[in-house]
Amino acid sequence: DTVWSIDYLNCIKEMENFYFSKKIQNILMVVNKDLSFDKKLKGDFNLKKNLLSKGDENQSIYTGCQILNKNLLKNINKKIFSINEIWNALVKKNNLFGFESVNKFSHVTDLEIYNKLLKSY
């Protein structure tokens, strides 16, 4: 889980403004993996001009913050599904948007990282 701080507030507001001003259907907040406290975390996406893609060497980590238009969910006929299904379909259409945070990224990946995070705060 992501450790959220007040530092993210402006970034979330900027992401929200981008979402509405560009009239897009989705946006995910990502951070460059170099800003991750846990250096073992691998990237989820690549970000270029606010578009997300996937490759062999992904440089951006999904933070856990996203805005999705409910219309993206209307064709899902399962009670339980992975949001990755929607993301992957949008990536294939070159239509998954990203917003880059420049905040340091702390994610409680496991007990070891949790204990290291405790010592750093």
Language model regions located:
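Catalytic-core segments of class I nucleotidyltransferases/pyrophosphorylases
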Residues: 3-9, 13-16, 20-21, 33-37, ...
